[in-house]
Amino acid sequence: MQTPKETLSERLSCVQDKIIDHYENDSKDIDSQIQYWQLIRWENAIFFAAREHGIQTLNHQVVPAYNISKSKAHKAIELQMALQGLAQSAYKTEDWTLQDTCEELWNTEPTHCFKKGGQTVQVYFDGNKDNCMTYVAWDSVYYMTDAGTWDKTATCVSHRGLYYVKEGYNTFYIEFKSECEKYGNTGTWEVHFGNNVIDCNDSMCSTSDDTVSATQLVKQLQHTPSPYSSTVSVGTAKTYGQTSAATRPGHCGLAEKQHCGPVNPLLGAATPTGNNKRRKLCSGNTTPIIHLKGDRNSLKCLRYRLRKHSDHYRDISSTWHWTGAGNEKTGILTVTYHSETQRTKFLNTVAIPDSVQILVGYMTM
């Protein structure tokens, strides 16, 4: 009859042989990575059992302390379960390597997300190139939603920090103000991504889409739509007294906002012809717009593709959505125009996917 040490030694040899097979095979399917973390879990369970029996070595290996084996086993369970959930998503057919699913990358910011395609972001503090810190923006970030499903997005880089959009909300995992407090003295910093310097009003999103440059600039609208009408007219805030921040890289100019009164729903929809009564509700120019409504990921790709048609519109927003139950999965892009003629030309020239709904209206700028 075998002793506990002999039994555990045999089991450990079997498990570790299979772990070595995973290293040698370097498989790229997600099921192999799930099996790998299950083996790591078993390996540490064997070490834990050995400690319980007072065994100090197995197969000439020193048996780790209780807390070490327990901690490693818990981490293996965490990664195994995360990968099992990811395997139920649309991303299971992508390549998944040991490097993509390693513990070090899982614990790297943003934590508890799978990440691929890292790109360097350099931040210079105090205007001093010798006082520089390097951060990572990811082409792909795979995160678990509140509903327990998995979604995919990309890291965006702004003057404020590094973030990804999780269920319609910007989730920052690095904030440069906090970093500046640690590494700077003057409270100023410059953000360099690719060949660009990002100022207060710009952001850049990393992407793995072959049709899109990984360092394309995403210009944000400075006016946020106000939810008075979901189909035609949207009131916006009017800003004034804004201080230039171009020469102060660490401080964005702050502006007071004067809000227009809500649009009276009895006025009806504004049309390209006739009198627009909304002009009387607040000061500013009424600008022709369209809302493009559809799947958020599809809109993100569409927004980038529309850049080659920039002569056919004035501005384009980032993807946004109305708050409330059931609205998080549907995104909206707002496109503004210099004139109704330009808008008409845009609609007649630019191909919009059938899955995207087009809503025509006006915005007071």
UniProtKB/Swiss-Prot annotation:
Residues 286-365 are annotated as: DNA-binding domain. It holds the Pfam family PPV_E2_N. GO terms for biological process: DNA replication; DNA-templated transcription; regulation of DNA replication; viral DNA genome replication. It is found in: Host nucleus. Disulfide bonds: none annotated. Keywords: Activator, DNA replication, DNA-binding, Early protein, Host nucleus, Isopeptide bond, Phosphoprotein, Repressor, Transcription, Transcription regulation, Ubl conjugation. Its main location: host cell. GO terms for cellular component: host cell mitochondrial membrane; host cell nucleus; host cytoskeleton. Binds DNA as homodimer. Interacts with protein E1; this interaction greatly increases E1 DNA-binding activity. Interacts with protein L1; this interaction enhances E2-dependent replication and transcription activation. Interacts with protein L2; this interaction inhibits E2 transcriptional activity but not DNA replication function E2. Interacts with protein E7; this interaction inhibits E7 oncogenic activity. Interacts with host TAF1; this interaction modulates E2-dependent transcriptional regulation. Interacts with host BRD4; this interaction mediates E2 transcriptional activation function. This is Regulatory protein E2. It comes from Human papillomavirus type 18.
